[in-house]
């Protein structure tokens, strides 16, 4: 039998556009964002019993470049991000904590279609390359030394959501602007909802890890692999509060 895991996550993000211009029939937008999030993964043993839980609290800073073809709506999103992690693994009243740093680069594209005046469907394709370095740590059972890990992912899916006074044809990092720079009441804010189911294929995952106890000769080194296919479901709400500021909340489930 093979151990199984399932997890969930949620985060909030604040982003702002720095430059918006038109180039050769395309709309170009660049900007920066900050995010804070929490994820939790439950691990089951071979017999289906609970083996432990891994939690991660993270804060991120990143930048984005968005290109939209004016006539067709086809878009491409390029994102670069750095993240600080605070992780905790719990099992049988034993806790292990570690801090670390991560990075991520992403290229995403999509093409929106109108179903109704206020409902859009958008097929999407995304490539992601990410890396993570964690500090060494120990718990009651022994020590763990982490190396640098990295992995690549390809995501295929679609986004279904409302279209309320906000351009839908963009990726996860940028949004079009409104004519009015400020809304004066909550009821006036353009708020959109969306759901995004996807299939994710992970490949070229690398990373060495060693662990052991104080006993001589107990050290073991192995290279866990994350290669495989997973299902992902995300949902969120977004509101434009100023001409170049979007507030959003997002949650997801992966298996």
For the regions a language model picked out, list residue spans one by one.
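Membrane translocator/pore-forming domains, dominated by Gram-negative outer-membrane beta-barrels
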Residues: 2-255
């Amino acid at each position: 039998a093979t151990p199984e895991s399932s997890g969930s996550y949620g985060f909030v993000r604040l982003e702002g556009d720095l430059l918006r211009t038109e180039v050769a029939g395309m709309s170009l937008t660049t900007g920066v964002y900050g995010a804070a999030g929490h994820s939790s993964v439950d691990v089951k043993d071979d017999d289906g019993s609970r083996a432990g839980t891994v939690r991660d609290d993270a804060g991120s800073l990143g930048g984005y470049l968005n290109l939209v073809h004016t006539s067709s709506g086809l878009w491409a999103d390029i994102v670069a991000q750095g993240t600080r992690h605070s992780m905790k693994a719990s099992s049988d009243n034993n806790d292990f904590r570690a801090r670390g740093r991560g990075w991520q680069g992403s290229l995403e594209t999509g093409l929106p279609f109108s179903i109704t005046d206020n409902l859009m469907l958008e097929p999407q394709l995304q490539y992601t390359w990410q890396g993570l370095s964690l500090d060494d740590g120990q718990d009651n059972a022994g020590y763990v030394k982490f190396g640098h890990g990295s992995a690549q992912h390809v995501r295929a899916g679609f986004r279904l959501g409302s279209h309320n006074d906000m351009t839908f044809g963009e990726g996860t990092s940028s949004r079009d602007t409104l004519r009015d720079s400020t809304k004066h009441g909550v009821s006036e804010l353009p708020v959109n909802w969306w759901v995004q189911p996807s299939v994710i294929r992970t490949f070229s995952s690398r990373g060495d890890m060693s662990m052991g106890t104080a006993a001589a000769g107990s050290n073991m080194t192995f290279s866990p692999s994350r290669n495989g296919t997973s299902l992902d479901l995300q949902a969120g709400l977004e509101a434009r509060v100023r001409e170049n500021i979007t507030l959003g909340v997002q949650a997801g489930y992966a298996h």
